[in-house]
UniProtKB/Swiss-Prot annotation:
It comes from the Bacteria. Belongs to the SfsA family. Pfam families: SfsA, SfsA_N. The gene is sfsA. This is Sugar fermentation stimulation protein homolog. InterPro entries: SfsA (IPR005224), SfsA_C (IPR040452), SfsA_N (IPR041465). One of its GO terms (molecular function) is DNA binding.
Length: 234
């Protein structure tokens, strides 16, 4: 995924009201960005460090600028836009990068499924093969060298694990795919210290036949894309 038009830099001042962040430009001007991340963004906020943002030409938008990347104090990059995860996975599937998920003829997004009124992020289908239901989660929390998900208690995430277990019980292929949008994360683990119920459900899901994958992103101010798989430590 290429950033076009090119991203612009600024210095993070603060994030507030969940969806807003103030930054300072090189000329000293302060502007407000839309923050496209509903999570806690735990360990992803570094006031004074460089952020990268995109700009929309849509005159109807209240906030024209969108926060895309955060630079860490060690020079790493974090993909702030959690909504990009699905598009990154679709792009990687079309290029055959996710080798565990090749051999399908069609890809659909946001299809209703399960018994808790959910929509699957990605549905892969092919003749004479079980349908493949993929839930995509963006992982950005780094603590003591380990990547974790979720970064806050996630009832929605718990529901999605139950839905995947249900689909696996029906004979479908059910996959949880972590998209690692943090260049310093090299493995993913359930955050039992944050959401113990999610961690327990993940173990049950694996025993129920749900596949769990994780892929790291290569990130720069020019582009972001899925690059290679990394371990999931349960």
């Amino acid at each position: 995924m290429h950033f076009s038009p090119a991203l612009k830099p600024g210095k993070l001042l603060k994030r507030y009201k969940r969806f807003l962040a103030d930054v300072q430009l090189e000329d000293g001007t302060e502007i407000t960005l839309h923050c496209p991340n509903t999570g806690s963004m735990r360990n992803c906020l570094f006031p004074g460090e460089t952020v990268w943002f995109s700009t929309s030409n849509n005159p109807k938008r209240k906030y024209a600028h969108t926060w895309e990347l955060m630079t860490t104090p060690t020079g790493g990059l974090i993909g702030i836009h959690s909504g990009n995860a699905n598009a990154l996975v679709e792009e990687a599937l079309n290029k055959g990068i996710i080798t565990e998920l090749t051999g399908y003829d069609s890809l659909s997004r946001e299809v209703k499924y399960g018994d808790e009124n959910s929509r699957i992020d990605i549905l892969l289908e092919a003749a004479q093969k079980p349908a493949c239901y993929i839930e995509v989660k963006s992982c950005t929390l780094l603590e003591d060298g380990q990547g974790y998900f979720p970064d806050a208690v996630s009832l929605r995430g718990q529901k999605h694990l139950r839905e995947l277990m249900h689909m696996a019980s029906l004979g479908h292929r059910a996959v949880l795919l972590f998209v690692v949008q943090h260049t310093d994360i090299h493995s993913v683990a359930p955050a039992a210290h944050i959401d113990p119920e999610y961690a327990n459900l993940l173990k049950k899901a694996i025993l129920s036949g749900v596949e769990v994958l994780a892929y790291r992103c290569e990130i720069s101010p020019d582009e972001i894309h899925l690059a290679q798989s990394c371990p999931v430590r349960v």
